[in-house]
Each structure stands twice: as structure tokens, then as C-alpha cells.
Amino acid sequence: MCIRDRIDIKKLIAYSSVSHMGYVMLGISAGGYLSIEGAIIQMINHGITAGALFMLVGFLYERRHTRNISSFGGIKITMPRYAAIFLFTSFASIGLPGLNGFVGEFMILMGSFNSYKVLTSIAAFGVVLAAIYMLWAYQRIFTGPISNEKNESLKDLDIRETLSIVPLVLLMLFIGIYPSYIESFVIQEAGFISETIALFKDIK
């Protein structure tokens, strides 16, 4: 699974992005209204969470000029605000209920099960795997004692960085609590795509 101590944090997020797009493809291929609506919402939510994660990795790279997991450890001691936001964003990425990542994934799984029972079951197991490797990475980077003296002088997020990431964090929370708001924007498109797929199936 390409998970090693010296793995690049940015690559880990990229692998996670591929996983999220797999859910999107499952939802679209199922062709149902609910699964397609979930796929559209998943793409929107993925843009928010992945964008935030890449920003956070960029902030860390500016300070240490490395993205290898083995170069870190215990940095929540010196960067508590950064650690809290990274954990929150990781929870959103793996689909914790109450955050934006849960909405699309749940709709895709529910809408795809009747069409692809086996694939949907595998996808549901993938949610667990995603949680494992994201939390594994968090543990290696942030928890425990500081394992590298270069990390002892790391500065926490400044005002500019905080203001740039907070809007994305608020979106993760808002969409997770009020999913109906974003559903109102995609409901028409989801219906059109679902009807088009059904039409092609009938022609076939």
C-alpha cells in the first residue's frame, strides 16, 4: 500500500485522492439518482478537504523543507494549532459523520448497493482502510516526543496561514451539518445525469 516511514506526506494525500475518485466512479457507474448526487457532492467535498490538506503540507514544507514522515514526530508540542486543524481535516477526509466527507460517501454507498453489492461492500471496507492510514500518518507526524531536534523550533501557524485555512475548515463543518444546502445546488444536475444514463441503458 506504499505506506512506509519515509513516505512523502504529499504522496499519501495523493493516494487518498485516488481513493476518493474511486467512490465517484462507483456512484456514477451505478447510475442511480442518489449515487450520482453523492458522486457530485463527493467531488465538491474532495476539492475542499484535499485542498486544505495540500495547503497544510505546504505550510509544513516551508518550515522544514521536507515532506518525509520519518523527519517528524511529536510536532503537536510546538505546533498545537496546526496539529488540531490537520486532525480535523483528516477526519473530514476519511468521512467522519458530521463533517463534509461523510455526506457524499454515504450517499454513494447507499445508492450503489443495489447495483453493485460486492463492489459497494469493498468500497465500504476502503473507508476503514483510509481511516487507518490517515490516522497512522497523524500519529507518526504529531504524537509522541519530538524525535528530531530540528522540529523543536518549529513555529505554529501565523495569522496569514490561519486565515487562509479557516474558511475551508468552516466549509467542512457547515456542509457536514447542513448537507441539504449543497444538495439543493446539485439536485437538478444529478437528476439529468441519472435520466441520461437510464436512457442509454434502455437503448442498449
Predicted regions and their residues:
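Short, small-residue-biased leader/transition segments that mark boundaries at the very start
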Residues: 1-3
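Membrane-water interface at transmembrane helix exits
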Residues: 5, 58-62, 110, 139, ...
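Helix-loop interface residues and adjacent transmembrane-helix termini in multi-pass membrane transporters
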Residues: 6, 33, 37, 63-66
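Divalent metal-coordination and catalytic microenvironments
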Residues: 8, 18, 46, 72, ...
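Interfacial and helix-entry/exit segments of alpha-helical transmembrane bundles
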Residues: 14-19, 24, 49-130, 152-171
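Helix-coil boundary and interhelical linker segments in multi-pass alpha-helical membrane proteins
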Residues: 24-44, 111-119
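Membrane-interface helix termini and inter-helical loops of multi-pass transporters
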Residues: 34, 38, 103-111, 183-191
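Cytoplasmic/organellar membrane-interface segments at the starts of transmembrane helices
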Residues: 79-81, 134-204
